[in-house]
């Protein structure tokens, strides 16, 4: 019986000529006459056992593919050009892909030009980018490859500080490609992370490129009232979907987002004041009642900073209170601060450089009702007076932007809305052009290079150019509206000495 001789790494395999002749695959068609010669056909780059498996498939249409042998069989099937086995191997690899092997499969797919495996491994890397940074192969990704991965719209990062940590870990292995840092968008980063990068001697150039990472864009949480029951909905920029998180039956409450949880603070239920605080995780939708505040109150002012929820002032029955207290996320004990100099409710509070600024609102007792314009600052564990606002305002909305405070006032006793800028370093107020007039609730938040205002429509105010954009939006029955980014960077005063500790803490929090 005639046979064809193959030599693989010095080992000989004799194959019946009839098997070669009957094979529909091009490789064997090309060598059908080669068996007449005495010399063996040398096969390079193929595993001996993998070639045996291919011969079994050609003969019996059966092949044993496992996660342990799939790569060597796939290589052989590509070289010998056996498409059905290639497909089986690729399906096996895709089925078994995970965060620990996706970079290796990504590199394998590039080496052999396997598009389906490339797409699947890329998808796995994108979905598990923080986990794959622990893979030794991560540092071997090229600059262009990592740029492509981190520029994907669905890359699984929830904050630009996380992107920064991924880049810093890669740069540690690739110090000649530090300019990859320029894919960052500084306006989405915390001041702490920007300072850390500066201390490392890295400079992020100003970019006009569009933001492609959906995960670093702002999430939105909205509470809308309907027949005394308010529905909480959450919008995720990664999924581009709105989901219902739950309901609340409170009125006159305040709310704030901290560590991906929505806190609902104080208010009234069935016309009775409450001092409880509820918390709902916006991802898991699980509710938890946290420790009660020190007293029953509504119309409090709230703000968050460094993982803490601050509750300031409020209305205790008919009397304004000066109580200020905070609760650290994940703990159960409220910590009291010194009382405000002037008790108030319905004012605004905002953090600037770890100092609390409180402004406006109403001071009331059983005999008095005073609309305030005064401003207090909590710094160095005490409240001090600052320059008052230009006018008295009972309803105030405030936001920090670029180290200063921007204030929009509501309408009660006033005839129109006002927009002010408080220059913190100069302790000085200036009045700015106000684009619209609106009677009713408003919601104000800082969004990178603009300030978002939800009133009778959606407005964007750009402080640097003092310009406005208007967008149609149904705002009926909205009780609360906020935009936020997920994951919070450990807050500290980063110095050359504390930098290694800070980066280590960030790596533990973000990349493990």
UniProtKB/Swiss-Prot annotation:
Spans of the Kelch repeats are 216-261, 262-307, 309-354, 356-403, 405-449, 452-498
Instruction: Please give the InterPro entries that the UniProt record associates with this protein.
Output: BACK (IPR011705), BTB/POZ_dom (IPR000210), Kelch-typ_b-propeller (IPR015915), Kelch_1 (IPR006652), SKP1/BTB/POZ_sf (IPR011333)
Q: Keywords in UniProt for this one?
A: Early protein, Kelch repeat, Repeat
- Which stretches make up the BTB domain? 2-67
Is the keyword Glycoprotein in the record?
no
* Pfam families named among the record's database cross-references: BACK (PF07707), BTB (PF00651), Kelch_1 (PF01344)
The BACK domain extends over 102-176
Q: Does the keyword Repeat apply?
A: yes
Q: Which family does it belong to?
A: Belongs to the poxviruses Kelch family.
* Protein name (database record): Kelch repeat protein C2
UniProt organism field: Vaccinia virus (strain Western Reserve) (VACV)
């Amino acid at each position: 019986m005639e046979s064809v001789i193959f030599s693989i790494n010095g080992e000989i395999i004799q194959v019946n000529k009839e098997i070669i002749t009957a094979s529909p695959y091009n490789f064997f068609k090309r060598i059908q006459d080669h068996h007449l010669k005495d010399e063996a056909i040398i096969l390079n780059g193929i595993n001996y056992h993998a070639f045996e498996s291919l011969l079994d498939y050609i003969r019996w249409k059966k092949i044993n593919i496992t996660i342990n042998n799939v790569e060597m069989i796939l290589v052989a099937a590509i070289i010998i050009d056996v498409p059905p086995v290639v497909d089986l191997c690729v399906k096996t690899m895709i089925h078994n892909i995970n965060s620990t092997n996706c970079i290796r499969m990504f590199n394998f797919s590039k080496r052999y030009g396997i598009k389906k495996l490339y797409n699947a491994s890329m998808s796995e890397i994108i979905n598990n980018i923080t986990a794959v940074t622990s893979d030794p192969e991560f540092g071997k990704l090229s600059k262009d490859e990592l740029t492509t991965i981190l520029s994907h719209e669905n890359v699984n990062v929830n904050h630009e500080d996380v992107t920064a940590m991924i880049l810093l870990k890669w740069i540690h292995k690739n110090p000649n490609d530090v300019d990859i840092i320029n894919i960052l968008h500084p306006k989405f980063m915390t001041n702490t992370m920007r300072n850390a990068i500066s201390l490392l001697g890295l400079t992020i150039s100003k970019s006009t490129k569009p933001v492609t990472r959906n995960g670093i864009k702002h999430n939105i949480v909205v509470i809308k009232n309907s027949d005394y029951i308010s529905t909480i909905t959450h919008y995720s920029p990664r999924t581009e979907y709105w989901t219902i998180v739950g309901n609340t039956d409170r009125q006159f409450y305040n709310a704030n987002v901290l560590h991906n949880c929505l806190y609902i603070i104080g208010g009234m239920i069935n016309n009775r004041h409450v001092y409880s605080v509820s918390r709902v995780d916006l991802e898991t939708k699980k509710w938890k009642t946290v420790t009660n505040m020190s007293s029953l109150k509504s119309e409090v002012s709230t703000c968050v900073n460094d993982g803490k929820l601050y509750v300031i002032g409020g209305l205790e029955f008919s009397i304004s209170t000066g109580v200020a207290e905070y609760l650290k996320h994940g703990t159960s004990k409220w910590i009291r601060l010194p009382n405000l100099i002037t008790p108030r409710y319905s004012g605004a509070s905002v953090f600037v450089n770890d100092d609390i600024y409180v402004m406006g609102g109403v001071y009331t007792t059983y005999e008095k009702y005073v609309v305030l314009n005064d401003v207090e600052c909590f710094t160095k564990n005490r409240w001090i007076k600052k320059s008052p606002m230009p006018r008295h305002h009972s309803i105030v909305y405030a936001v920090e932007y670029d180290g200063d405070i921007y204030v929009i006032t509501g309408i009660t006793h006033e005839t129109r809305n006002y927009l002010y800028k408080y220059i913190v370093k100069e302790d000085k107020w200036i009045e700015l052009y106000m684009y619209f007039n609106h009677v009713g609730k408003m919601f104000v938040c800082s969004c990178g290079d603009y300030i978002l205002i939800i009133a009778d429509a959606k407005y964007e105010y750009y402080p640097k150019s003092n310009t406005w954009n208007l967008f149609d939006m149904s705002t009926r029955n909205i009780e609360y509206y906020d935009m936020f980014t997920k994951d919070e960077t450990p807050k500290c005063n980063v110095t050359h000495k504390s930098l290694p500790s800070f980066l280590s803490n960030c790596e533990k929090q973000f990349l493990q």
